Amino acid sequence: MVDYDGNYVDMYVVNTATGERKSALKKLRSNTNFTQNDWSPDGNWVIYFQNKHWHALNTADGISKNLTQALGVAVHNEQHDAPAPAGAYGTGGWTSDSTSLLIYDRFDVWQVYVDGRKAQNLTRGEGRKSTIRLRVQRI
């Protein structure tokens, strides 16, 4: 659907063995952050950005968890000044064991866990203190 409020997509989880298709998410904005969806290495989780927060969808049970609500910092672009929702600062990707992923706020890097463990600020707030954007660089 395309209207004055932007482009939306629905997400489905498909069992590749049986072809069974289940509706997982409805009305995700595709024009801001749909391309930022990212599957966990084990395929059990997919993250998506909606309503200024990162969420993880468990593909087995269809339950979503808000990963960033308790951080106390914005993970969306606070300086966004346009008539559309602000986008995310992005992610640094999943850990190889699929238990957590790296998420950016404006300056720092956070490790958030899909099992509900408390998030960790990996850069210890040094980016915010120095107003320097710290990001993961794969070499």
Regions found by a protein language model. Give the residues of each.
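Beta-propeller blade signature
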Residues: 8-19, 56-58, 62
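Blade-loop segments of beta-propeller domains
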Residues: 23-38
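Surface-exposed loop and turn segments in beta-propeller and other repeat-based domains
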Residues: 25-29, 64-86, 123-139
